[in-house]
């Protein structure tokens, strides 16, 4: 996938989640 410039180590994907990104390996991917 494409990195969404948001991490999800402590909190889940927030802004990028609205763009269809999901958490994988502590990073939000599209």
UniProtKB/Swiss-Prot annotation:
According to its UniProt entry, one GO biological process term is: defense response
Q: Which UniProt keywords apply?
A: Disulfide bond, Knottin, Plant defense
Domain of life of the native organism? Eukaryota
Q: Does the UniProt entry include the keyword Secreted? A: no
Disulfide feature: 4-21, 8-23, 13-28
Q: Which part of the chain holds the cross-link Cyclopeptide (Gly-Asn)?
A: 1-30
Q: How is the protein modified post-translationally, according to the record?
A: This is a cyclic peptide.
Q: Does the keyword NADP apply?
A: no
The UniProt entry's sequence similarity note says: Belongs to the cyclotide family. Bracelet subfamily.
Q: What is this protein called?
A: Cyclotide hypa-A
Species the sequence originates in: Pombalia parviflora (Violetilla)
Q: Taxonomic lineage of this organism?
A: Eukaryota, Viridiplantae, Streptophyta, Embryophyta, Tracheophyta
């Amino acid at each position: 996938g494409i990195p969404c410039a948001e991490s999800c180590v402590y909190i889940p994907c927030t802004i990028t989640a609205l763009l269809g990104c999901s958490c994988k390996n502590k990073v939000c991917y599209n």
